Amino acid sequence: MQVLPPSSTGGPSRLFIMRPVATTLLMVAILIAGIIGYRFLPVSALPEVDYPTIQVITLYPGASPDVVTSAITAPLERQFGQMSGLKQMSSQSSGGASVVTLQFQLTLPLDVAEQEVQAAINAATNLLPSDLPNPPVYSKVNPADPPIMTLAVTSSAMPMTQVEDMVETRVAQKISQVSGVGLVTLSGGQRPAVRVKLNAQAIAALGLTSETIRTAIVSANVNSAKGSLDGPTRAVTLSANDQMQSADEYRQLIVAYQNGAPIRLGDVATVEQGAENRWLGAWANKEQAIVMNVQRQPGANIIDTADSIRAMLPQLIESLPKSVNVKVLSDRTTNIRASVSDTQFELMLAMALVVMIIYVFLRNVPATIIPAVAVPLSLVGTFAVMVFLDFSINNLTLMALTIATGFVVDDAIVVIENISRYIEKGEKPLAAALKGAGEIGFTIISLTFSLIAVLIPLLFMGDIVGRLFREFAVTLAVAILISAVVSLTLTPMMCARMLSAESLRKQNRFSRASERMFERIIAAYGRMLEKVLNHPWATLSVALGTLALSVMLWIVIPKGFFPIQDNGIIQGTLQAPQSVSFASMAQRQQAVSDVIMKDPAVESLTSFVGVDGTNPSLNSARLQINLKPLDDRDDRVNTVIERLQSAVAKVPGVELYLQPTQDLTIDTTVSRTQYQFTLQATSLEALSTWVPQLVTKLQELPQLSDVSSDWQDKGLAAYVNVNRDTASRLGISMADVDNALYNAFGQRLISTIYTQANQYRVVLEHNTEQTPGLTALDTVRLTSKNGGIVPLSAIATVEQRFAPLSINHLDQFPSTTISFNVPDNYSLGEAVESILNAEKTLNFPTDIQTQFQGSTLAFQAALGNTIWLIVAAVVAMYIVLGVLYESFIHPVTILSTLPTAGVGALLALMLSGSELDVIAIIGIILLIGIVKKNAIMMIDFALAAEREQGMAPRDAIFQACLLRFRPILMTTMAALLGALPLMLSTGVGAELRRPLGIGMVGGLLVSQVLTLFTTPVIYLLFDTLALKMKARFPKREEEA
């Protein structure tokens, strides 16, 4: 029977050691709660930290960019600008379309923003053109966020107009109703319509005008209330044949009489069933298709949204005819799942490596099982808290848990090693557990809270980066906290029941060999430590040298924002000369598609040409290139992009800009490249002067590639200069002129055909195939006040000018965005610096403002906050350690280890060719918390030896270093192996995980070597300093 130690022995662990059943059941409860929590955790690529963003689209077919800007965009902007919580407003006004993108503060709920946007639209309604086909439509979507799913709908038996009609009514509307879906767009422009192509010569010969015919059509096709008859016994509803439904009916419409004979619409026009907009087209690979892009609402979970769509797709496809084919061309969740799966594998590998290193050091199966139980218990228990906090299983939280495998085992190792030491001295297991756990309890608390203190500044980081890493920091802190609880409860209880002197003495060939190796290493360390302690100033010089080297490396290392991921999807923009026609642009797009589809890494391609609110001009085409899975291709996305751009460069008359799709989208504008720099001015004239100069200068910089701007002011325009005096004498107003031109060349939507399921338009235009180019203007006729027919040329002259293809605004002022990529051999930090230097050399006038946008702006903010973040982490840790040790000096000794971690991390990043990005910075902050544990374990034992055994400071710290050498080495190796799978990651999303692993492994290796020698030297130097201070101010010490 064991004699129990006094009740004061064991500290907070005593209750749990003495009550093994209660302790076991408590741990089982934590395990079950974590398992249940895991089942309820959603899966995503990253924490949902999107800015609340709303896009407002207004279509005005036939209107020039100038008209769209002044008549639609400006009135809307004035109303939107009054909304509270608005962070940024950008707009793009192109031919026939206005797109306003509103980005709100992170703190504003999206539903509240939606209400404000609707109220602003209502307030602006009276200021908008009365002939708008439809009022402004808003969507809760970020236009820069790539689609979560892309589907292609094709048919070899049905016309595309019929296919789109069915897809819109039977598929798109149902998908739009799915929770999390922000916008479903159908690209391809094949919406059914009745097209009326006027024969200008026939109209002129009959003495008619387009306005006469338009009025006749509008009057002949109506759908309005007619009332009812209410008799004595029954009521009768009135109806009439006031609607015309087909092209045949319109063809027979009488538009005028001449000499008593009717003139039918078919006599003066070609009337046909066609598409509402003939300047739109989409293709899937090489086949014409209706392309359906599904975008999520900001903040919606991608996996849940895509799963809901996938679940309903079979039923939706079943509702379509057999001749209609629906194919999912891209699904972002495929790569997200693969990335999360790879991270989960790395988590399991880290756990296995940590358990392996524990066995190597402890050389005992029962002693290995105890910390091996602590690892999954701490990690699984974290899931329960994650559910409560509304977190998700994503790359960052899984990275936190992977890193935590090395942390959570530290506490258990320290406890086991201390208890084992007492058992080996002859203590009974129960007494050893009580004594060892009580002795080490303060050290565990110090390790835990000082490590959590490092994470506190991450919780207070502002803007989107802070939101992004909040889940990472909290997840890691919770895992560490649970591990501390497990180490002070379950671990000593298991030690008391599973460890014994016999089991610890039991050795095999491996354990004996490893023991001899450790003894030789410890002996060699002791000899080296003796020499180091004899040369304190040289050692101090090394410590100061690491600090200076850390600062130098921090200055010179290339800096980035967020690693560029290979998600298997490439977004592309094809650019042609500004005067290109739709037909020519479609031909060029097909030529580029031929080249792209030949690449062995490409699986599928969707492309789109035309202006519809998502594409700004006819000389632009949008492409989405879907690559084969990473395992099925030889090259990563950057290599594929370089290869595709080189191949497409041989196609004449086009420029191709490509960028890989990323999980983190901060931008709100659809850009040609990864990064943007914006110029804002009070007038378009100022931009036209300075933008070309800056673009030319930036294109010369080696730090930038793919430099281009969205400034397009060389579109061809025909300026109709009306002689107002002549027009007035003839009784022709400017409204008459505009109407005549709009009827002829605007694809004017003049009437609506109503059906039970949908509404279709009647489109009016001149048949420009008969009179192409500017000569078509000669066919325009107007009616004078006397009823005579007047050709446009009688009252106006036409001159050809250059005009903008689109007009962009940023916060209501004219702006232009310069897009650029960064070559592989340069960093984003170097690119930003080169742009700012180029801007200084041009000496812009005061009315031009510049700023970076999107991820580049976030990079600047993150870089500016990094130093303060590290300082805050150090200060937080100093405060916690000062409180725990009740000392101003000992925390400084502990924190003196930090420069060694910085040197190792920065060197590792530079040698591996990695940038110092936000992921790597998080790793360095974690290192601040890890490396100080070596000093804590040394100083705790040294202080105890001085206090309890009366040892001299040098003897105490020397003994502490030797006694704690093995657990220090063990815990460092555990943390290193926990980070090793991240460093060696090669799967999907590896770009995101690797910088964290590289920085931590490098920092741990260097700090492990240096802190074993610098910490005891600095401890003694501060002790000497303290003694001198006491001798110099004895009275103050006595009073204190």
UniProtKB/Swiss-Prot annotation:
Q: Which UniProt keywords apply?
A: Cell inner membrane, Cell membrane, Membrane, Transmembrane, Transmembrane helix, Transport
Q: Where are the transmembrane segments?
A: 16-36, 342-362, 369-389, 396-416, 440-460, 472-492, 537-557, 869-889, 890-910, 911-931, 968-988, 998-1018
**Gene Ontology CC:** plasma membrane
Q: Which InterPro entries match?
A: AcrB_DN_DC_subdom (IPR027463), Acrflvin-R (IPR001036), Multidrug-R_MdtB (IPR022831)
Top-level taxon in the UniProt lineage: Bacteria
On subunit structure and binding partners, the annotation says: Part of a tripartite efflux system composed of MdtA, MdtB and MdtC. MdtB forms a heteromultimer with MdtC.
What name has this protein been given in UniProt? Multidrug resistance protein MdtB
Upper lineage:
Bacteria, Pseudomonadati, Pseudomonadota, Gammaproteobacteria, Enterobacterales
Point out the gene that encodes the protein: mdtB
